[in-house]
Regions:
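Membrane-interface helix-loop junctions in multi-pass transporters/channels
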Residues: 1-125
Length: 125
């Protein structure tokens, strides 16, 4: 296909498969925890995306594999929305708290990841 870099598509697909499988495993481990597995996956994923953003140039194959692929598959907006709507039916206040916590943990995790991933004085992280 003209204009499509199939090697990069492959890296994203492989990473996405691994990330999605990891999220499924997390959900199985915390099966009785309601929306907690999605909250954990999104917060941890945001932190790790922050670290990757600070550490790896945007156009590298490794960043595509780990960031767009693996962490893109590990984190999930659709499950976040499904969980929010599920909570809304019986507990609208809890749904709002979950949505707010997801936003705060996501942005906070990404900011902490960026900070953790940046080299410190002396060139070492």
């Amino acid at each position: 296909v003209a204009g499509v870099n199939l090697r990069r598509v492959f890296f994203v697909a492989v990473g996405g498969t691994v990330g999605t499988a990891a999220r499924l495993a997390l959900g199985m481990l915390l099966a009785d925890a309601g929306v907690v597995p999605v909250l954990v996956a999104n917060a941890v994923g945001a932190f790790l995306l922050g670290v990757l953003t600070a550490r790896l140039p945007a156009a590298t194959d490794l960043r595509l594999l780990l960031g767009t692929g693996a962490l893109g598959g590990f984190t999930t907006y659709s499950a976040f929305m499904t969980g929010t709507l599920s909570l809304w039916a019986d507990a609208p206040l809890l749904a709002c708290a979950y949505a707010a916590a997801s936003l705060v943990l996501g942005v906070g995790g990404a900011a902490l990841g960026l900070r953790a991933g940046r080299p410190r004085a002396g060139g070492r992280a």
